[in-house]
C-alpha cells in the first residue's frame, strides 16, 4: 500500500513501527541467498515506497532500524543519500587566507558556523578588523530572516604556550633545520628577531631550569625535534633529531618537563578584555591543566563577560588526567590533538579523543575535535582518504564541532576545505546508530526534577517514536536547545530565539539549527508562541528538511521568560 500525505489513519501507526523494523531486519535474514542475503537488502527507496515519504528521514533508514550495532554496520549503504541538514558545526580559523569579507561570505555559504581567531598571532587591531569583517559578512545574509545564518566568533587565547621568535629573513621566511646539526636554543633577547638555522630564540625564560640533558624539545607540532646535549650560559645546546623547515612564531613543546608558566599571562588578560569589549561569543582557553585555570579565565572575563562560553582546550598529559574536574567548570571541551600528540604518545591520542568525547556526551556538554583534520588541504584541493576518515570518525564518535586550523587560516583552498568537511559530516551523520545512542544516553542520565530536562528527554523519545522530521524549540538562553541536543535526536532541532547571542552560541551543540526571531513580542503570549513556531516551520521548509505531511515535535514554555520550558506537542506540517 502507499500512504499519502495527510491521510494516515491513526490505527496504522503501530503497523508502521513494526514494518520499519521488520523491513530493515529482513535485509539481514529474510532475503533469499542464505547468510549473504543482506547484499540484496531492501533499499531506502523500497522502504519509503511501502510506508510513504512524509513521516521520517530516509537516509540510511534500514541501518537506523537495525536491532544490533553489527546489523547496523551491515546495512549501511554507500548509495544512500547524506542527511539533508548537517548537524555537526564547523569551526574555521580566520587568517590571511580567509579574512576578507567576500571570502568570509563564501565560507558562510559553504557551511562555516563558528569563526575562530587565534590570538597567538596578530595584533588587537588586526583581530578587530577581522571581527568587523566576519559580522559584515554574516549580516549580508540578514535580508531574509528565514535564511539568515548566525555566525559565532571565538577567541582562542595564547595561553601558557612557548613559541619561537622571528627569523632574520622576515615574517614570511623559513630556514631548514638539518638533521644532525647543532642548534642553540636561547632566550637572549638580541636573537628575538634574528633567528636562523643555528640559533632559535624562545619566549620561555626558565627553559634552562626545566629541561635536562637528554630531554627533547619539539617545534611546530613535533615536525622538528631537538635533543639537549648541553646546558650552557647562553642557552641549550641541542642536536637535531628530526629536521625540517622552520618558520616564524612556531609552537614549542617540552614533554615531561614541569613548565611553571602561569595559567593566564598578562597578554591573555589583555586579550580577554579585548574579547569582552568586542562581544565575542566563545573563549577557547588554551593549555588548561586544572579546574582553577578555567576559574581564572571566568574571573578575568568579569561580570560583563558572564554570558561568554568557555571551552577548555586539553593539550597536555595533566589536562587529560584532570579531565573530570576541568569538564565540571567548563562550558565545553576542545581536543587540541596537535600539542596533545606531542605531550602523550601519538598512538594514544585516539584513546584520549574517544574518552573525552564520551564523557562530554554523558555530561551533555559540547566537545570540539581539532587539529590536522584536513591538513593536506593547506596546499592541495583534495584531502587524503585518511583525513576524510578522520573527520567522519570524529562525527561518529560524537563530536559536536569539527575544526579547521591552517586549512582556512593560511591555506590555498579555505572554501573548499569547509565544503569538504560539510560533505563528510553529512555522510557520517547518516551512519550514526541513533537508536542505540539515545537509549544509552537516557539510561546513563541521572534522575532529574528539572522540568526542562525531563521535557527534553520526552521530546527526543517522541521524535523517535513518530519519526519526526524536526523538533522546534522556543528558547531564550539556548539551554533548552542544548538539553535536546544532549540526547542526540535523529531529527533536526530548530531553535527559535530572540537572543542574538544565544542564536550564535547554540552552534556549539550538535544538531541545533538556530533561528533569530527579530519581531517584537505579541500582546497575547499564545499568539506570540504560535508565530515563532510558524517561523521555525517556514525556515525548515526553506532549508529543505521539512515537507508537507511531516510530523514535528514542538517544545515551548508555559509562560514568558527562561526556565519555564515544559510543554510538548506534536504537529503535522500543512
Swiss-Prot record:
The GO terms describing molecular function are:
ATP binding; kinase activity; magnesium ion binding; potassium ion binding; pyruvate kinase activity
Residues the entry annotates as binding K(+): 118, 120, 156-157
What are the binding positions for Mn(2+) in this chain?
315, 339
* Pathway linked to the protein: Carbohydrate degradation; glycolysis; pyruvate from D-glyceraldehyde 3-phosphate: step 5/5
Recount the known activity regulation: Allosterically activated by fructose 1,6-bisphosphate.
Q: What is its EC number?
A: 2.7.1.40
Q: Where does beta-D-fructose 1,6-bisphosphate bind?
A: 475-480, 525, 532, 559-564
- A Pfam family matched by this chain, by name? PK_C
Q: List the GO cellular component terms.
A: cytoplasm; cytosol; plasma membrane; pyruvate kinase complex
| Name of the protein | Pyruvate kinase PKLR
Native source species = Mus musculus (Mouse)
- Which gene name belongs to this protein? Pklr
